[in-house]
């Protein structure tokens, strides 16, 4: 499922740190060397490299990268080098600064990360920003958006495969009633989406589809053309049930004839490379009839392109 290619014989972190230090030395920066190392190391290996680099050269590797790199390439390398909880904490913070109808970052984090990983994200957020995600969400949202987002970032979902089919039937009926009434911010509607396990919610939505003839997101789409809350609600359901479809959509919207959304493109590649990028690539190919790496290569260039394509699993590890 992950697209990351790590060499069979990984160099020692001391050797990687030394090579990175050399990449920063002399006239100019050796971007190719940076990519050849960092784009082919997993999270644990990158963390070790950072620790060794700091101990050896008395400088945070991230600060060194920040001094040497620039633009979209810098953002991609920096996001990738961060530990996943640190990265999600940073992305969540940036998200609270710019809530827009297409800003799904908090939904992605809350709905696609495992429960224990989400706790680590919240701990990293508090350590870095001296406040909780919940505080910032409450401060920067209001109304229905706040009503949906707060329980999403606060929940601790059960992650087992156990499913109660009687509950699935009864809650599918509740969801259908609320959709029929257009009560999309109803307490029970939000409670079901924000607290049930993914397995339980999947059973509920399957029953909804079978019993009422439509997938719930198809019903919701009829109301969501100009409604930010409805778009967010649909993103929640997609992230909880078919995350690869959500991330394919973000990539598709990021790579288009109207210009590239480097923020969305970089975010998806750096956060999903070690998780489910192969599945996202398959979905992108199915939906757009072009391989994702080729689409990215057509829309980007230089070291930025090379970094993203390497994370997709292309090139030598």
UniProtKB/Swiss-Prot annotation:
Binding site for Ca(2+) 3: 300, 305
Induction remark: Up-regulated by heat shock stress. Down-regulated by cold, dehydration, and salt stresses.
UniProt xrefs under SUPFAM superfamilies: Annexin (SSF47874)
Disulfide bonds listed in the record: none
Subcellular compartments: Cytoplasm, Cytosol; Membrane
Phosphoserine: residues carrying this PTM: 95, 289
Binding positions (Ca(2+) 1): 24, 26, 28, 68
UniProtKB keywords: Acetylation, Annexin, Calcium, Calcium/phospholipid-binding, Cytoplasm, Membrane, Metal-binding, Phosphoprotein, Repeat
Phosphotyrosine, modified sites: 129, 284
A UniProt-annotated Pfam family: Annexin
Domain of life: Eukaryota
Main location: cytoplasm
Family membership: Belongs to the annexin (TC 1.A.31.1) family.
Domain free text: A pair of annexin repeats may form one binding site for calcium and phospholipid.
Name of the protein this chain belongs to: Annexin D2
Species the sequence originates in: Arabidopsis thaliana
Gene name in the database record: ANN2
